[in-house]
Each structure stands twice: as C-alpha cells, then as structure tokens.
Amino acid sequence: MDTPETSTPYEQVEKGSFFSFRPQKKRVTYHLDEQVGNYHYGDKHPMKPHRITITNHLVMGYGLHNKMSVFSPRMATFGEMSEFHREDYLDFLKRVTPDNAEQFADKFQQFNIGDDCPVFDGTYEFSQRSAGASLDASRKLVQGQTDIAINWSGGLHHAKRGEASGFCYVNDIVLAILNMLRFFPRVLYIDIDIHHGDGVQQAFYESDRVLTVSFHKYNGDFFPATGNFDENGVKGGKYFALNVPLEDGIGDEQYTSLFKSIIEPTINTFQPSAIVLQCGADSLGYDRLGVFNLSIHAHGECVRFTRSFNIPMLVVGGGGYTLRNVARAWCYETSICVNEQIPSELPRETLYYEFFAPDYTLHPRLTTKIENKNTPKALEDLRIRALEQLRYLGGAPSVQMQQIPPDLTGHLEEEDERLNDEYLDKAVDVRVRG
C-alpha cells in the first residue's frame, strides 16, 4: 500500500492563489502551516510565533515561492507525537488551558511548565502544527519527492520526551528524524542555534545511526548549561554526539571557517544518507537573547556549505528573538536552498515592509560591541578535538546490526488516510491575509 499523502499542494486547494504550487526543476519543498504564526506565548515572552508569518510574507514578496513547491501540512496526531513523547505528557498538553491551569498545577513541575514554557491558548495545537510540518517535510524526503524540505516553524530542539524546555513543547526534529531513519541508514543533525541542541542529542545519545553536531555558546551556565565537548554519547552512540562549545562574540570569519573545517570531515567520515539542519537565528548579532556577532550572510553560508554536499536535507528554524532579523535570515536561507540570488533591497509590496525600517534591507549591519572571547588558539583546539573524535567513529556504522525505530505511520495508516481525505474535503483557505 502506498504511503498516503499527508499534505496538500496549494494548487489543489485554491487554484491561482498567491501560494499556488508550481512544479520546478529545483526540488525544494516549503511546508507552510498558515495558522502557526497566530499563537501567542504572552506579551513579555521572547518567543513570538508571528515571526513565521513575517518570514513567509518576505519569502513570497521576493517571489521565492515560484522556485519551490509549497505544501500545506496537516497537524501531527497524538499517536504520531507519542512515537517519541510520553502519552501522559501529551495528554497534559492536550487538556491544559489558561482557564483550567489551576486544576493541573500539581503537574507543572513534573512537565517543566513555567515562565519559559507557559500554558497559552492553543499550546497543544501549536505543537501539532510545528511537528506536523516537520513530519510532512520528512515524508517528502523519504518518498524521494524533494531534495530539500523547509519548515521554518520547526526546530524546537529543547523539548524532551516527557517535559517542555526552552520554549519548546514537542520536539519536531526528533519525530522527523525517527521517520527518516525508517528509510535512511544514517542521519546527520547539525545545529547552529546559539543554544545547545540538548533535546535532540539526548534522544539519540545511545544511537550510532544519528550523529548530532551542535555549535553553541557554552560556559556551564548559559541555557541549557549542556553541550561541553566531553558530552559525546554513550553505549552504542559513543562518539556520535559532537559538541562545539563557543564563547561570546564570535564573528563571521571565525564561525564559518570553524563550521566548514568540522562539517566537511564529519560528512566524509559519517557518510550520512540525509541531513537535518537546525537554523536557529539567535546566533545572529543583535539577537535579544544572543551573544554572538554573526551576520545574515555568515549564518546563510552555513546553509550554503551544507547544501553543497547534495545530500537530502531537512531545513528547520529554531531560536531567534529579534523578529525582523529572524525573518531576514530565514528568507535569505530560503533563497540559498532554491539557489536564487535576491537583492538586498526588500520588496516594497511585502505586507511587513515598514517593519524593517529604517534601512529596508535584507542584510543590515549586525556586528555588536560584544567582546570576542574566542581566541584563535581556542578555536584551533576545538577543531583538533573534533577531528580526533571523528577518528573514533571508524567509518560509517553497520546499519544492518541496528534496530530500525518504530514506523511512525505503520499502524496509523488508516487514520492517516482518513485525515488526509478530511483535509482535502475542507478545501482549506490559503489566501494571503492582508
């Protein structure tokens, strides 16, 4: 039985719409849930899902949607999310609301609910949408329907099996990788968020089929206070977690040089069948929660370099708390994925044009006054240690000896087909909202 379609090309939903699907030679898919940007963590909370809406409008304003296939994914089901997450945790997320939160207060500590991860209207549905888009993107990859799949609403890398963490409730990345492992022998996970990708590392800490590589700020205190070099995996996954702990203020040349000098030998040694690239934009200069000095060009160069290996790739978002720069970065990186050069001058017709005042440019100067504490010697030591760790991998692992993770769709095929039929019947309205 063929795997049922789980997302809808926009031309099937509304022909002639702004988001219409147009087949292109470049096999890039863009997985867009138009509702995911409508959720609100709270007035003073730094996480603003609306950044996804701004990003999408900028992408469309540049006409990049004409260079890729845009899909509207369905939300992830409880069953799909429970392939990684504990059912009691998911049940809590499904039932709790701001109105009844007091009834669940005794569970807050257990599930790490608080200031960082509050209960807001639609917490569960927001997580379903983010996870659903990453799962949909992973399906397109494993079915051979695309070479690069993009979900900017994904990348929520801190969520654990049974608790929320760091603004993340459901780990869409882990769910997508589990699905990909059913078809791809080895998956390389790369994380350029300023925060350590602890949730993904923890999920695959004993596995030699997933190699996690995280470039992040680390001083033993900066959230999540993990990701030192000595965290390198256990049991069968020993040496399959590679951490690159950095100090404040790293700039473009240092970062991109270090990234390339580690990622190239990593790919050559591990020989991944697919790559998941988490593009957290809080590593940019002037981020509200960041302490690096990266430009949008440098951040995008990591995407460009990873793309150059021509390996099937899932690209997701992540952190990023200065909204206009998040949208700029992810739009620019979308242009890299479709191999399209776009001008720095922003398109005037985009709905959020005035949001980018006063410069109205894709590449503002983002260098800050944060002192660069990364010495050339320290970075060279990191590079050498990374190469030494790669030597222990002994080449690509013997996949035949490894257990394949459970089928994310297997026993859910009938439900999946039913949900897809319902989705098509609804003829979802995908008109751009002005």
UniProtKB/Swiss-Prot annotation:
Alphabetized UniProt keyword annotations: Chromatin regulator, Hydrolase, Nucleus, Repressor, Transcription, Transcription regulation
Active-site positions on this chain: 158
Gene Ontology BP term (one): negative regulation of gene expression, epigenetic
Xref: InterPro entries: HDAC_PDAC, His_deacetylse, His_deacetylse_1, His_deacetylse_dom, His_deacetylse_dom_sf, Ureohydrolase_dom_sf
Gene Ontology CC annotations of this record: cytoplasm; cytosol; heterochromatin; nucleus; Rpd3L-Expanded complex; Set3 complex
Keyword Metal-binding: no
Region Histone deacetylase, annotated ranges: 26-339
Compartments, record wording: Nucleus
EC number(s) stated in the UniProt entry for this protein: 3.5.1.98
Top-rank EC class of the record's enzyme: hydrolase
GO molecular function: histone deacetylase activity; histone H4K16 deacetylase activity, hydrolytic mechanism
Reaction equations catalysed: N(6)-acetyl-L-lysyl-[histone] + H2O = L-lysyl-[histone] + acetate
Matches recorded under Pfam families: Hist_deacetyl
Role according to the record: Responsible for the deacetylation of lysine residues on the N-terminal part of the core histones (H2A, H2B, H3 and H4). Histone deacetylation plays an important role in transcriptional regulation, cell cycle progression and developmental events. Histone deacetylases act via the formation of large multiprotein complexes. Is not essential.
Family as reported in the entry's similarity comment: Belongs to the histone deacetylase family. HD type 1 subfamily.
Protein name, UniProt field: Histone deacetylase phd1
Organism: Schizosaccharomyces pombe (strain 972 / ATCC 24843) (Fission yeast)
Gene responsible for this protein: phd1
